[in-house]
A protein has these predicted regions:
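C-terminal nucleotide
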Residues: 2, 8-13, 17-94, 101, ...
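Intrinsically disordered, low-complexity linker/loop segments enriched in Gly/Pro
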Residues: 94, 106-108
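DPxDG-like acidic metal-binding loop motif
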Residues: 108-129
């Protein structure tokens, strides 16, 4: 997929839900975030301050000084600030509390990142593929599946279409979790160092 080979992508029945609560707190505008795992426990909590960038005049987010786990927070910060660039009206004049909830174990690798990006893109009314570029990267096939909510034939963000995958053997297809989930960004960087035959891709 990273070399635009024609690929079939199929969503799982599990997903990620996002609830947005708007708060009329204009004195200090805050965006608080809580990510909840399938077992009901929080696996990330953070706060961001929303303020106007004096150079661009746009809203911009920065870390609250008390926030922890900045690795995840940094990724969220990039995604949300990119969403503001794509839609300057996003996050205007209010504070927000966001909760996300996974239907699956994060170690399964079923798309906690891509479903997050799709949810934020729908909320901000922006292009999910553009948000993906500043966060996790990749081919974008999972973004297409997440935005459509169904099967897709995929080559690139500009070359994909919906598809109905309904073979007679569909009841014999199973998901087997090997407990070998890898870091997506590291896997992509490792793949890009390899030479791939154009004949195979085509």
């Amino acid at each position: 997929m990273l070399d635009q080979a024609l690929s079939l992508a199929i969503p799982s029945v599990f997903g990620q839900h996002m609830h947005v609560e708007e708060l009329n707190d204009l004195e200090t505008r805050i965006l608080s975030w809580r990510s909840i795992a399938v077992d009901g426990n929080s696996w990330y909590e953070g706060k961001f301050i929303i303020q106007e960038d004096p150079l661009s005049g746009l809203n911009a987010l920065k870390h609250d000084s008390n926030s922890q786990n900045h690795d995840i927070g940094d990724i969220l910060l990039r995604i949300l600030n990119k969403a503001i660039q794509l839609n300057p009206d996003f996050l205007s004049n209010k504070s927000y509390h966001i909760e996300t909830k996974l239907d699956f174990n994060r170690s399964w690798g079923l798309g906690s990142s891509s479903t997050l990006i799709c949810n934020i893109a729908k909320w901000a009314e922006v292009d999910a593929f553009e948000l993906s570029k500043v966060s996790f990267g990749g081919s974008g096939y999972d973004i297409a599946v997440g935005m459509l909510g169904g099967d897709v034939l995929y080559r690139s963000p500009s070359m994909w279409e919906g598809y109905v995958f309904n073979p007679p053997f569909k009841e014999q297809i199973f998901f087997v979790h090997l407990n070998k989930k890898q870091n997506s960004r590291e896997g992509i960087n490792s793949y890009k160092k390899k030479e791939v035959s154009k004949k195979i891709v085509d």
